[in-house]
Amino acid sequence: MSKFIQHTGIVVPIDVSNVDTDVIIPKQFLQKITKKGFGKHLFNDWRYVDEKGTILNRKFILNNDIYKNGTILLARENFGCGSSREHAVWALVDYGFKTIIATSFSDIFYSNSLKNSLLPITLSKETIDILFQEVYKNMGMFISVNLLNNKIFVREKQYSFKINSFNKYCLMHGLDDIDLTLKYSSKILNYETLIPEFLKK
């Protein structure tokens, strides 16, 4: 898993509440268990006007040249609701997103994001409203996210966000569940030598 310490990128505003995982990555594309290749299907039903995904919907924001290289997604409340498919996070990461800023996330989506180096940031509705106003006034605006200091830098302003210290540590060191287990493998093996034989059966 890649490390997340600091990132500066273009903000892509998705001004919609309750964006569910079927919108993020429709079910017909969930045929792989590898994490690559889902980016081209991100927001498929919004990005394309045909079922084959060959004709772009020019009204959708990711098809705007200003935003096509965006890496920070700005959203409303309950982002990532719906089914628990981790493919939704894979699609966002594969497209190039590094962080999502929203009023709230579904619990499972939030957890899946942390396990894939996608930083989910929650801010108050009032702050999210301000950020949307800034983005609309300054299309293609860059902002910076600093995980070390828990700060978002937007032009001359800065906003603080909260994150669990354990999740922060894992993101900054690029550790997923497997990495964490391997980190303590020697202790696990030592503990297993202490288990009585009758408990091993």
Swiss-Prot record:
Any one cellular-component term (Gene Ontology): 3-isopropylmalate dehydratase complex
Enzyme class: lyase
Enzyme nomenclature, EC number: 4.2.1.33
GO biological process: L-leucine biosynthetic process
Catalytic activity: (2R,3S)-3-isopropylmalate = (2S)-2-isopropylmalate
Entry keywords, A to Z: Amino-acid biosynthesis, Branched-chain amino acid biosynthesis, Leucine biosynthesis, Lyase
Listed pathway(s): Amino-acid biosynthesis; L-leucine biosynthesis; L-leucine from 3-methyl-2-oxobutanoate: step 2/4
CDD domains attached to this UniProt entry: IPMI_Swivel
GO molecular function: 3-isopropylmalate dehydratase activity
Family, similarity comment: Belongs to the LeuD family. LeuD type 1 subfamily.
Function, as annotated: Catalyzes the isomerization between 2-isopropylmalate and 3-isopropylmalate, via the formation of 2-isopropylmaleate.
Oligomer and partners: Heterodimer of LeuC and LeuD.
Protein name: 3-isopropylmalate dehydratase small subunit
Organism listed in the record: Buchnera aphidicola subsp. Baizongia pistaciae (strain Bp)
